[in-house]
Amino acid sequence: MLLSAVNKFFLMILNKNIFFKVTVISLVIISFFLGYFLRENSTGGGLEFYELSWPIIQSFKKDFLFTIKNYGSFRDYTIPFSHILNAYINPFSNDVENFQLSVTVISFIIFLVFAQVCKKIFRQINIIDILLISSTILLLPFYRTSAFWGKNENYGWLFFILALYFFYEIKNDISKSSNNRHTINIILFCFTSSCALYARQALAFLPISYFLYLFFNNADKKIIITSIISFTIFAIPALLLILTWGNVFDLENNPNFFTWWIHPKHLLKNFPILLSFFGFYFLPILVIEFFNLEFKNFINKYLKSFLFALIIFVFLSQVNLLSYLGDYTRAGGAILKVNYLIQKNNYLLLLLFSSVGFSVLMRLFKEDVKNNATFLLPVLIIYCFPNLLYQEYVEPLILIIFFLVLKTNLQKIYFRNISFSNLIFISYFTVYLIGSIYFKHFAFDSYEKWKIFLNVQ
């Protein structure tokens, strides 16, 4: 049986088309590990590991209770779940280089997990094509930086992907009577989504989206009851932190956290930026759709909503309600930085991408409100809460949601000519990676140089 499978695999490789795809996958993987050994820092945030994450991990190894009680003094505004995992489960956390390599390997394994879940959902698609699609996350600058420098973010994506796998299983049986297998899937979803939340607090949208989905799809009451009980149990660590800190975050050492950093007042300010992120990550998918549809049909799908959003944004900019978009030195995303490179303090390019993002979201809402809106609306709200919206917050979130959550004809169009689609997809994010490396390693290798370019003191 094993010999037969091996022979089949090598016969596939002998096919020229398959051989080319395997070569591309191999090059992506090589670039990923090469990035680690060359100390790639394509988003500029890698070095903060030594000032933030590493001291916390070592403190946890020495004294758990002291570190918990004084966690806010480390200036980390997250729940310490990932640090605890690193301190007590990662066997390489005694040495910096070994630890960073271990996180790089874990991040590579996440790519394989992502591929496996994609294959589960898109069973008719060849495994080589699935691997090629999934390898895209290995090209994403923020994902790579987190991996190479031992940062925490990628743990959140691991648990998020696992949670979406169990949610996929739950959706398939949502109207059926509960059985042991179904109950186990519910408990595992609640566990993995809770871990995802503890690793990245913005992923709190997932339990919210889950319950909204159950409500709008008339889920069996046993599913809802089992979910509530499970989430209550998995919330116990958070309750213990609240008892220790007096809040969900350590406000004694960070008293302005809920007034300066996380607050609903930032919703409107961040909305154009978040829309531009959707436009940025969906652009290659739209290019693929453009080549698969007649020009008129493509334009009819998006033109009205695009022009509506663009007119609104241009009007708001003319009355100076969006002038703050020209004053960013941090955050805002790649498109805003490219916009500044073209013309300082200008944000027209960002508004164009925001309009594209708005148009895509309107299309997704129309296609399946019960599924797509229940996931996307909580994302749009929760991710607009921070004072500064960084692109790393949604990378690779938007791509994961597209392939594992959304119900859209864009997926069918992508798979219609999958070789061409993968070529566009991989090429787009390769250019993005190369641009990020050039920007951070050569053009502006320090924050001070970027501020000098912007004429900001």
Map each language-model feature to its residues.
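Transmembrane signal-anchor helices characteristic of membrane glycosylation enzymes that use polyprenol
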Residues: 17-50, 234-245, 308-320, 380-383, ...
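Membrane-proximal lumenal/periplasmic loop motifs of glycosylation machinery
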Residues: 38-48, 62-87, 96-107
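Transmembrane-helix motifs of polytopic, lipid-linked glycan transferases
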Residues: 101-124, 162, 166
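Transmembrane-helix signature of polytopic, membrane-embedded enzymes
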Residues: 114-140, 157-158, 180, 184
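Membrane-interface alpha helices of multi-pass inner-membrane proteins
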Residues: 133-134, 183-200, 207-212, 231-237, ...
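Short acidic/glycine- and proline-prone juxtamembrane loop motifs at membrane-interface regions
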Residues: 145-155, 390-391
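Specific aromatic-rich, kink-prone transmembrane helix
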Residues: 155-176, 185-193, 207, 216, ...
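Membrane-lumen/periplasm interface segments of specific transmembrane helices
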Residues: 197, 203, 208-213, 219-334, ...
